C-alpha cells in the first residue's frame, strides 16, 4: 500500500458489504479516514471496529434523503472534512419478474435508492467540497446501464440515469475543481445479489445465477469473473490525484464485456 489517501476523508454508502466493503477496506489501507454508511447495523459496526480509529459507521437508509445529508455533516464534524464521496448503495429490485408484471412500488424503491440517493449524495458532498478546494465524487453504476437487455429493466434504467447524471454533474461542478466520475462494474461476484433477492426460491436463484454467469463468461473477452479488488483499484484511481484531470468519465470494469462479444474461432 502507498498511503495515497493519507489525511483524506471518504464516505462510502452501502459500505458494510459487497463492493462497498471492498472500497472501504482499500481506502482505509491507503490511509483514508472512512465513513461507512449502511442500513446493516451489525455488519457496518463490525467492519468499522475491525478497521479501527480511522473508520466510523453511521446507520443510514439512503432512500431517506435527510439521512444522506446526515452522512456528510457527520463526516465533516467527526473527521474535519470531506474529500471523496462514493455513492455505492444500490438495489436490483424484484428479480425473476417479467416486465409486464412489474409494479410502480418496485420502480419507486429502485429509483429512490439507485438514482435519488446518488443525486443527494453528490449534491451534499459538492456543497462542502465547493467551499474547500474541490474533491472527488464516485458514482457506482453498472454495465446494465450501458447495454440494453431483457430483465431487471427498472434496474437498468436507474443505472443509465446515474451515467447521464454523472456526466452532467461533472460539467456543472468542474468550476469548483470537483471531479465526478462513475464506475460500471460487470459480473463482480458479491453477496449483494442474494441480499436483494431475499425471499426468492434459493434453488431457483442459484440456478439462474449459474446460467447467467456461465453465459457472461462465454461472451466476455476476459474469461474470469471480476473481483472486489478490480473495482477497488478503479475507485482508488478516481479518489486520488492520479485522476486530477479526469471528470465525467464512466469506466467499465467488466473484462471487456461492453466492448463486444467474443466470436468463436474454428
What are these model-predicted stretches?
Residues 184-200:
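Short, flexible catalytic-loop segment of classical short-chain dehydrogenase/reductase
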Residues 122, 158, 166:
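Active-site helix of classical SDR
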Residues 127, 171-175, 244:
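Alpha-helical segment proximal to the catalytic Tyr-Lys
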Residues 95-99, 103-108, 216:
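Substrate-binding pocket helix/loop in short-chain dehydrogenase/reductase
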Residues 142:
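Residue(s) in the substrate-gating loop at a strand-loop-helix junction
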Residues 3-35:
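Canonical Rossmann dinucleotide-binding motif of NAD(H)/NADP(H)-dependent dehydrogenases/reductases
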Residues 96, 236, 247-266:
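Short C-terminal tail/terminal secondary-structure segment
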Amino acid at each position: 500500500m502507498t498511503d495515497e489517501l493519507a489525511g483524506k476523508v471518504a464516505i462510502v454508502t452501502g459500505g458494510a458489504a459487497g463492493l462497498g466493503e471492498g472500497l472501504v477496506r482499500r481506502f482505509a489501507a491507503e490511509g483514508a479516514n472512512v465513513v461507512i454508511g449502511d442500513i446493516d447495523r451489525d455488519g457496518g459496526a463490525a467492519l468499522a471496529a475491525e478497521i479501527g480509529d480511522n473508520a466510523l459507521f453511521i446507520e443510514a437508509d439512503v432512500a431517506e434523503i435527510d439521512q444522506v445529508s446526515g452522512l456528510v455533516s457527520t463526516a465533516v464534524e467527526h473527521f474535519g472534512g470531506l474529500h471523496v464521496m462514493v455513492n455505492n448503495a444500490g438495489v436490483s429490485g424484484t428479480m425473476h419478474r417479467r416486465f409486464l408484471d412489474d409494479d410502480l412500488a418496485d420502480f419507486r424503491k429502485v429509483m429512490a435508492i439507485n438514482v435519488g440517493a446518488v443525486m443527494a449524495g453528490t449534491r451534499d458532498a459538492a456543497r462542502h467540497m465547493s467551499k474547500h478546494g474541490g474533491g472527488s465524487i464516485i458514482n457506482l453504476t453498472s454495465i446494465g446501464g450501458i447495454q440494453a437487455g431483457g430483465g431487471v429493466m427498472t434496474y437498468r434504467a436507474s443505472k443509465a440515469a446515474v451515467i447521464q447524471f454523472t456526466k452532467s454533474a461533472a460539467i456543472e461542478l468542474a468550476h469548483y475543481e470537483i471531479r465526478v466520475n462513475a464506475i460500471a462494474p460487470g459480473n463482480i461476484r458479491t453477496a449483494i445479489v442474494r441480499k436483494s433477492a431475499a425471499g426468492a426460491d434459493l434453488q431457483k436463484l442459484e440456478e439462474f445465477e449459474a446460467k447467467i454467469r456461465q453465459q457472461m463468461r462465454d461472451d466476455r473477452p476476459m474469461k474470469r469473473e471480476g473481483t472486489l479488488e478490480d473495482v477497488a483499484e478503479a475507485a482508488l484511481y478516481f479518489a486520488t490525484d492520479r485522476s486530477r484531470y479526469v471528470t465525467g468519465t464512466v469506466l467499465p470494469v467488466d473484462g471487456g464485456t461492453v466492448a463486444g462479444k467474443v466470436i468463436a474461432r474454428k
